[in-house]
Amino acid sequence: MTTLGEATDMRKRLKTASPLCQVHKTNGTLNPLLFQEEFAEKKNNEYETSQPYQHILLKDVCDDRFLSQALRELETHVTLSFKETDLFKVLQSVDLASLDTAEGRKKCTNLTKLRDALYSDTFRRAVERMTGCPPLDARVDCSCNVYPHGGHLLCHDDVIGTRCISYILYLSDNQEEWTVNDGGALELYPVSKLVHATPSVHPTKKILPLWNTMILFRVQAGQSFHAVQEVFAKYKSRVSISGWYHVMTHSSSATRNASAQALVHGMNAYTETTHTNTEVKLANTCTFMDTKFSPTFGREDRVFLREWLNDAYLDMSGMLQLNQQLDKEGIIVLGDFLNENIAKIVREKIKLSAANGSGCLDESSSTRWVTCGPPHIRRFLRYCHKETKQTKQDHRAELSEQSMDLPSVLTAICDRVFHSSAFRKWMASVIGAHLRVTQGQVRCFRPGLDYTLAIQNPTSASEKFSLNLCFVNDFGNDDEKSWSSGDVGGYLCHMKTKPFEKMSTPAEVYTEENEEKVSSVDATFNTLTIIKEDENIVNFIKYISKSAPSCRWDIISNATRSA
């Protein structure tokens, strides 16, 4: 637990700011301009025509001096809790409704005054006029949120219960201008034209968290998708009071929790965006490989895989131990999975890509990269390729060729190892069953952009297993520490959750009672993770911070136990 003052100890001391101009000056709370009919009509016109969905931005919401005093009370008297899930990383206060005690009102006089003003009948009526929304309830639902360096909130639509209007009042330091380079912008996502109630992979509007401004937008299922961009600034924090105005009456449709339900129950609306920014709906993201092969892992298979894999994992007794561990723990992590000869080639390609600036790319870098979405579930790049054929007898010489860039090398490993009958036999021995194996994919997670969120698996009669072979630049001591600290994300998180039908929001998988069921695998070069899946298991790749040493590249595949 920490206070805002402790969380932002690097920021400058606030000076007394200039008040609103005399015509708008109030007795220390909200700008009287907000209550004028002409202003409300103007803002309503802006609201109705705004894109990508209805929203408005208000400036000079409060008297500057008053807001500075409220901020000082936040810094001094309000306790913040650090919260991190697959969806966010933030310092958050309790609901500010809890300040309704004698001590709370005494210590936070201006803060409670601000809260009361925001939920007053007068201001709620003003919000109704500006947005055209139904009558709003007096229910207080707000908190203080502080996003320090690396803080973020990924794409979601805010739809829970009777929420009608979302608002954010910014209290970020007014003594140093907030710029685009600082990050922390509110990102608004348009809805895909291809897939109903699904956000496009990229936002089309970004709003900076400027001092004494307020954003309001209508909460709409499958429409109001937004995110808080990662805060890139090292010595600034994005500070806000945010919350919701609720409708007075409860409708059956109001309980729908669109983006959260997609995370919990999964969805088929996966999308990809090509380099031409054309979205493509994927009816089925998995292609099963032909599995007609002898299930016995034999000498020829071992000889073949020794050219690629660490020999320590090809011993029969070692494979038996892996099988027992997977059966007991549900997860195994194999470091130094590729042999040193192959790993050296990949390592050099990663260094080369960093040196020539292609280490962290986007879909415009190559016609072969596509962005996978939708962003309220996932965002990363997938490398599209046709299966390659070996052109040289010595595959090490071929992989080392200058014409082979990093994605080409990873593609070759995917094709020649993951798609080989020898590897499928090895997998069958480790898992202990005949398998159907999906075609592997090469992915790239870019710093400051990419992630997958926790999606609960649907119930299945067949046992399923996921494979993930990870590569990152952790070659220097500082790089290794950065990844292992977890501060820059990129790790694979593996969790046992509540029973399928009882889990209602993404954050529920992180309740304190489930903390002991959470495990993570650091983003580490040349590490294979195999996970046994079921309907009570969720996995995700944590959002990768812009300050990460490199992209995270991986090769993934899935296997299903045959009947």
Give the predicted meaning of each segment:
Residues 2-20, 145, 150-151, 158-163, ...:
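Catalytic core of Fe(II)/2-oxoglutarate
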Residues 7-17, 24-30, 35, 46-51, ...:
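PAPS-dependent sulfotransferase catalytic core
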Residues 26-27, 78-80, 135, 175-180:
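Proline-centered turn/helix-capping motifs that create local helix->coil transitions or kinks
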Residues 35-130, 309-311, 319-426:
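Non-heme Fe(II)/2-oxoglutarate
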Residues 64, 121, 125, 165, ...:
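A structural signal for well-ordered alpha-helical segments within the folded catalytic domains
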Residues 68, 162-165:
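Non-catalytic, well-ordered alpha-helical scaffold segments
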Residues 132-141, 432-442:
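Short, surface-exposed acidic
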Residues 408, 412-432, 438-455:
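C-terminal structural cap/anchor segments
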